[in-house]
Amino acid sequence: GRGIKKGNPKTTYIAYGAETRKSMLADDSEKLLNWYKEKGVTPKEYYLVVGRFVPENNYETMIREFMCSKTTKNFVIITNVNDKFLDELETRLHFKKDSRIRFVGTVYDQELLKKIRENAYGYFHGHEVGGTNPSLLEALGSTDLNLLLDVPFNREVALDSALYWTKKSGSLARLIETADKMSGSEIEAYGAKAKERITKAYSWEFISSEYRKVFLGK
């Protein structure tokens, strides 16, 4: 407001933090295997989204484009479903006829969620409001291949460590098919870049050092 502008306060921006460590769960963990069996999905055979189930996160675009793609992988959506919004999406998209679309509920076990992220073939991030998002940082720290909506703050966070799509019809569908054809070494290279980006700019060690500079002058 006007008072803030008049005061001309000195401000400092400090981002969220994220981890790059691996999940403590093993690939043969009973908890993990039971989750996969219950949801009917296979490691490295699904694209993933984790986030609030609200229109501004572009679920409609992601689901529509996924349905238009020729991928044989599943689309796993981890969210607390809002029935009204879900019904609206079904009315517009008829996604229930596509067996690849999997709404699997929520996952509150953080080690299990981290492992599910690690085992995703790719991660979709459709947020376009709100600035730097913790779920994007977590994805970059855990998932090798990230497909992000092309908005300034997503590019500012991920730089060249991710692939980008727009809301234009066909953009994400084509990118999914491109991603499906990528070699293991190409995907690993993106994963290494993403983790390097988190380590340099968003690790908790780096964020803590930024706070020390502000409060302790160190």
Model-based region annotation:
Residues 115-131, 144-145:
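Acidic donor-binding loop of glycosyltransferase active sites
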Residues 1-34, 41-42:
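Donor nucleotide-sugar binding/catalytic pocket of nucleotide-sugar-dependent glycosyltransferases
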Residues 36, 40-57, 63-70, 76:
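Conserved donor-binding/catalytic core segment of Leloir-type glycosyltransferases
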Residues 88-111:
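Nucleotide-activated donor-binding/catalytic signature segment of Leloir-type glycosyltransferases, i.e.
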Residues 185-216:
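A charged, aromatic-enriched C-terminal amphipathic alpha-helix characteristic of glycosyltransferases
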Residues 162-170, 178-184:
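Conserved acidic donor-binding segment of nucleotide-sugar-dependent glycosyltransferases
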Residues 17, 50-54, 80-82, 107:
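Short donor-sugar binding/catalytic loops of nucleotide-sugar-dependent glycosyltransferases
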Residues 114, 136-141, 152-156:
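Short alpha-helical segment that forms part of, or immediately flanks, the ligand-binding pocket
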